[in-house]
């Protein structure tokens, strides 16, 4: 795991500076995020509070009736330690109103609906407080497509999108995220008893090492096998990365003009300012 070890103090300064500068570029001073009680959102809350000041950070916990009460307790713990603005908004009435019309929906559809309901709440708070929405998906999740398009993957700014889950743990330790949050099993908490690693079928530490070699170091299949990764595992992960690529792109626009958005018409976020 040597390749995944990071200089946490340097990483902290980079990400804090990134949040501060990108929010400033938009002409704003505040940020809003979903605080789930998990380690990813907790880390983003810590980074945002340092970058913008706790008074400029708005966190929402949005439980559903099947959510683990521990999740809300951990989210509240993080918010209270940081002194950020905090609110709990129950999404059960909105979600259940829809599923009364489609009662046969499976867990995946229900989970996606919950994630998108939370996204609409965050963007409403963004409008209410003139605050930029911060993403909380890490690099592992983004590469695997382990998230809901236009749900938890939706944000204006993602400070941790280029660090693997293993590195999220490292930086969280260094920044003093509560032990209860760091040590619990990762879970999207979309249905009772759900855990990320059980659903994925492998551990984050296993897949992070493979993804690092595959993506960052550009090792080919034979090189990965020579390092001890099984061919089945390599093929499974490569398939997940390839099949979820559409989640990492803007909607594809049919090109019919000389300058097409996101192809020939590309400018930095602070263009013209």
Curated annotation (Swiss-Prot):
Subunit structure: Homodimer.
Pathway this chain belongs to: Cofactor biosynthesis; NAD(+) biosynthesis; NAD(+) from deamido-NAD(+) (ammonia route): step 1/1
Gene Ontology annotations for the cellular component aspect, listed alphabetically: cytoplasm
General function of this protein: Catalyzes the ATP-dependent amidation of deamido-NAD to form NAD. Uses ammonia as a nitrogen source.
NCBIfam families linked: nadE, PRK13980.1
Organism placement in taxonomy: Bacteria, Pseudomonadati, Thermodesulfobacteriota, Desulfuromonadia, Geobacterales
Primary gene name: nadE
The protein's Enzyme Commission number: 6.3.1.5
Organism encoding this protein: Geotalea uraniireducens (strain Rf4) (Geobacter uraniireducens)
Name of the protein: NH(3)-dependent NAD(+) synthetase
Pfam families: NAD_synthase (PF02540)
């Amino acid at each position: 795991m040597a390749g995944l070890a990071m200089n946490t103090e340097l990483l902290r300064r980079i990400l804090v500076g990134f949040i501060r500068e990108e929010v400033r570029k938009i002409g704003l001073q505040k940020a809003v995020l979903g605080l789930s009680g998990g380690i990813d959102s907790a880390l983003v809350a810590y980074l945002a509070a340092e970058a913008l000041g706790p008074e400029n950070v708005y966190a929402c916990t949005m439980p559903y009736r099947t959510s683990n009460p521990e999740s809300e307790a951990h989210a509240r713990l993080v918010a209270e330690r940081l002194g950020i603005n905090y609110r709990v908004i129950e999404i059960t009435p909105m979600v259940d109103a829809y599923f009364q019309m489609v009662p046969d929906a499976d867990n995946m559809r229900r989970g996606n609906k919950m994630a998108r309901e939370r996204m609409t709440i965050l963007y409403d708070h963004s409008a209410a407080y003139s605050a930029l929405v911060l993403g909380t998906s890490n690099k592992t999740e983004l590469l695997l497509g382990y998230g809901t398009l236009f749900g938890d993957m939706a944000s204006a700014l993602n400070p941790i999108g280029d660090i693997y889950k293993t590195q999220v743990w490292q930086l969280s330790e260094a920044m003093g995220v509560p032990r209860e949050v760091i040590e619990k099993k990762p879970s999207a908490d979309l249905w009772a008893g759900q855990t990320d690693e059980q659903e994925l079928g492998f551990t984050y530490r296993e897949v992070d090492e493979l993804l690092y070699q595959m993506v960052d170091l550009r090792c080919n299949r034979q090189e990965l096998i020579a390092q001890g990764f099984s061919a089945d595992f390599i093929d499974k992960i490569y398939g997940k990365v390839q099949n979820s690529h559409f989640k990492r792109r803007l909607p594809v626009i049919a090109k019919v003009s000389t300058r097409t958005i996101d192809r020939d018409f590309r400018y930095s976020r602070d263009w013209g300012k």
